[in-house]
Curated annotation (Swiss-Prot):
Record's subcellular location: Cytoplasm; Nucleus, Nucleolus
Keyword Cytoplasm: yes
Pfam families assigned: Ribosomal_S24e (PF01282)
Lineage: Eukaryota, Fungi, Dikarya, Ascomycota, Taphrinomycotina
GO molecular function: structural constituent of ribosome
Name of the protein this chain belongs to: Small ribosomal subunit protein eS24B
PANTHER family the UniProt entry points to: 40S RIBOSOMAL PROTEIN S24
Signal peptide, first to last residue: none
Length: 134
């Protein structure tokens, strides 16, 4: 599928402070559907001779009429620096971090409203009791 796909990079910059290379990526895919982010990561890793785990592609937009997409790519020096500097949600997207498990919205509201009903020293006891239940 990806035989006639060309990937070009422009506005290349080495960012020593954040231990990465950053660039704008132009993808030419005439007559074909968009490439997946994983395919783009693998091709960029081949081009820059690095591991695909250290590559992050995002912000990909297809131009009107198709056949051409543009986005942004970051190639980190190591996976440790990627985990240190990348936003958590992007690490979750590529499977390098677990999503944050939040308490359900309704449970948060119920707990807040239970707390409103108790005043003074009883509030302290109620808080302790609710922590024991959770």
């Amino acid at each position: 599928m990806s035989e006639a796909v060309t990937i070009r990079t422009r506005k290349f910059m080495t960012n020593r402070l954040l231990q990465r290379k950053q660039m704008v990526v132009d993808i030419l895919h005439p007559g074909k559907a968009n490439l997946s982010k994983n395919e783009i990561r693998e091709k960029l890793a081949q081009m820059y001779k690095t591991d695909s785990e250290c590559v992050q592609a995002f912000g990909l937009r297809t131009h009107f009429g198709g056949g051409r997409s543009t986005g942004f790519a970051l190639i980190y020096d190591s996976t440790e620096s990627m985990k240190k500097f990348e936003p958590h949600y992007r690490l979750v997207r590529v499977g390098q971090a677990e999503p944050i498990q939040k308490v359900a919205r309704q449970q948060r509201k119920q707990r807040k409203n239970r707390g409103k009903k108790v005043f003074g020293t009883g509030k302290r006891l109620a808080k302790r009791k609710s922590k024991q239940q959770d």
